[in-house]
C-alpha cells in the first residue's frame, strides 16, 4: 500500500530507490515482525545494526580498509521508508503511534570525515583530454567530445545522455551587457535519463525547478558540437547517442558512460575519476572565478544553492561562465 502511493506521487527514480531498499533490507530484517511488535526498541535496534555494519574495500595498493556499509544518507533513506510504512499503519489504526518519530536523528559516525570532493586540475585535464583524443576505446565510447561537453557545461551524467540537438542553440542567443551585445551559444537542460527496474531507460523533466536551466557553452565545446552536427539529424535525436535496435540513434545509458570511463581512467592515472568528477571540475572552475556570485554558480549547476547563497531570485544566464570554462579547457 505504501509503495503504491510512492509510485503515484514521486518520480520513478525515487520509487525505484525505495523499492530497492525495501526489498533488499527492510523486509528481510523487519518483515517477519507483526505491526504491534514494531516498537521503538525494535526499530532502534534495526538502525543500530545498520550503523555498525562495515564492509571491506580493497585500496589501489592492494591493502584493505574497513568502511561504513550504510552511510548516514542511506540510513536516512531507509528511515523514510520505515517511517512511511508505519505512518500508513497509524492511518489505518493498526498501531497507535509511529515509533520512528521517537528515534534519535541519524548522524555520521564519530570521527568520520567526508572525503573532500576531487575535481580535475589543469594538468589532469590536459592529460585526460590528450589521452581520450587518441585512445581507441575512448574514441569508440565517444568520450573526447562528451568529456569536454561535461566539463564545459557541468551537466549530470543523466542530463548529458538526455541532451538532444533541439536543446542546443549553437548560433547563440543575444545577451546585452553594459559594454556590448553578443551571441552566446547555450544548452537548455530540460530532461534527464535514468534506468527504472521493469521499465528500462526512462526520461523525465527533472525533480526540481532548479534542474531546468539554460547553460552557456564555451567556444571550444561549441566548435566541437558544430563539427558533429551535419544538418540532417532529427532534432529529437540525442547528441551523444547510442544505436537503437532499429539502427536509429537513441539515448545512451548512463551506466555505459561509466563503463567507458572505467576502461580508460587507470591509463591516465585517474583511477578515482567518475562522470561526476567532471561536474565537480566545472564547479571548481566556477568557484575559482571570484567575479561569479554564489547565486550565479548555483544557477549554472542547477542546484538550490551553491555554498551560502539560498534565498535569492534564480534562473539568469551568466554568460561570463563560458569564457572562464573555455580558458580552462584549452
Give, region by region, the residue ranges found by the protein language model.
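Catalytic-site neighborhood detector that most strongly recognizes the C-terminal catalytic loop/helix
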Residues: 176-181, 193, 301-325
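Active-site/catalytic core of tyrosine-dependent DNA strand-transfer enzymes
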Residues: 123-126, 143, 191-198, 216-271
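Short, polar N-cap/turn motifs at the start of nucleic acid-interacting alpha helices
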Residues: 167-175, 186, 272, 291-311
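N-terminal core-binding DNA-recognition domain of tyrosine site-specific recombinases/integrases
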Residues: 3-94, 99, 114, 136-141, ...
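Conserved tyrosine-mediated DNA breakage-rejoining catalytic core shared by Y-recombinases
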Residues: 102-108, 162-230
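C-terminal catalytic core of tyrosine-transesterase DNA break-rejoin enzymes
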Residues: 91, 148, 152-159, 256-263, ...
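Basic, Lys/Arg- and aromatic-enriched nucleic-acid-binding interface segment
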Residues: 58-72, 76-80, 91, 95-163, ...
